[in-house]
């Protein structure tokens, strides 16, 4: 701090400013008021705004030193340092909500120099500095804006233009709180009762953002209420649609049942089905007795095998009307199953007809073959009963034993014929 104070005379560019090294708190407002006066138009220094900013910081740090040395007799107020008491309140056009908007009426304690630097470099002041730099409509700032905003003839520059203590004071004829374009925030980080008119934003969005009580309902609550209302309406509509759909399904089901019953009980339909069943049964090569016995294989509850006469009476339409109606779905199920099996047989003839056309050659083991040769030596032409007994004893099929005896006789005949000739 002392190094900055020692460099202070080298950066004093305003001829109207006196050389105050440690101005008092009462004279600091007068010095700041003189510092905020517009720059002479013929000044050739291009870094006037930077010089003003450095000068303002040096004076503020000097005021802090005096406040610390004097103790609690002169409590330091950041707002009192950077704002005059008779400054004109500015209505802010910015709607950016402040990060800390707490109204407290007690005085601040004396700040240390490090605290003041932290206070100057806080994010809220950076936000206000950016907003102050945006107020170019009031007159345009210099090349290097200070923490207070745009420094120039028309802009609110230096400590008065939204400095470390907050926003508010106007700087120059065209300044007035950031100019007509309004780049300055209307409130400070720590507003005081005398800045009450500057600290409030009249925009409803800003009031909502600052969590201030408002007469308007919260948009989230409105959206939630609308969402729940829409969900309830949708649920009611869905329930109504489900009820209507169930009623329509019941009506359609009843109509379908009535149509099915009508088609089943129609005598002409029964007659046409009986004729069609007879023709398809004959085409399949199945007798009426086979149909009656095959009905038991369908495993329909309450349905067993039927006699051949029942199938014949159905085809000739001599059964009663109720029996015809009861027998029609059973015969239709059998007919569909028989036709399906016939189609599979036609599609794969090698599986069904191959076994019948080409029978696998039978192979007899050696022990059974020796036993058969012994029986053949005793009796080359056994009777049918003897062949059955031999087959049962050797655990062979009767037809296999019969064919073996026949083949063995033919073999013996060929052997005798070859020996003779």
Curated annotation (Swiss-Prot):
Inducing stimuli: Up-regulated by the osteoclast differentiation factor TNFSF11.
A GO MF label: DNA-binding transcription factor activity
Outcome of gene disruption: Mutants have defective suckling and uncoordinated limb and trunk movements, leading to early postnatal death. They show a loss of neurons in the trigerminal ganglia, the medial habenula, the red nucleus and the caudal region of the inferior olivary nucleus. Mutant dorsal root ganglions are defective in sensory neuron specification, and sensory afferent axons fail to form normal trajectories in the spinal cord.
Subcellular compartments: Nucleus; Cytoplasm
Protein name according to UniProt: POU domain, class 4, transcription factor 1
Family: Belongs to the POU transcription factor family. Class-4 subfamily.
Protein task: Multifunctional transcription factor with different regions mediating its different effects. Acts by binding (via its C-terminal domain) to sequences related to the consensus octamer motif 5'-ATGCAAAT-3' in the regulatory regions of its target genes. Regulates the expression of specific genes involved in differentiation and survival within a subset of neuronal lineages. It has been shown that activation of some of these genes requires its N-terminal domain, maybe through a neuronal-specific cofactor.
Taxonomic placement: Eukaryota, Metazoa, Chordata, Craniata, Vertebrata
POU-specific domain mapped to chain residues: 262-339
Gene3D superfamilies: Homeodomain-like, lambda repressor-like DNA-binding domains
Tissue expression remark: Expressed in mature osteoclasts (at protein level). Brain, peripheral sensory nervous system and retina. In the adult nervous system, predominates in the medial habenula, superficial gray of the superior colliculus, red nucleus, mesencephalic nucleus of the trigeminal ganglion, nucleus ambiguus, inferior olivary nucleus, and peripheral sensory ganglia.
Organism per entry: Mus musculus
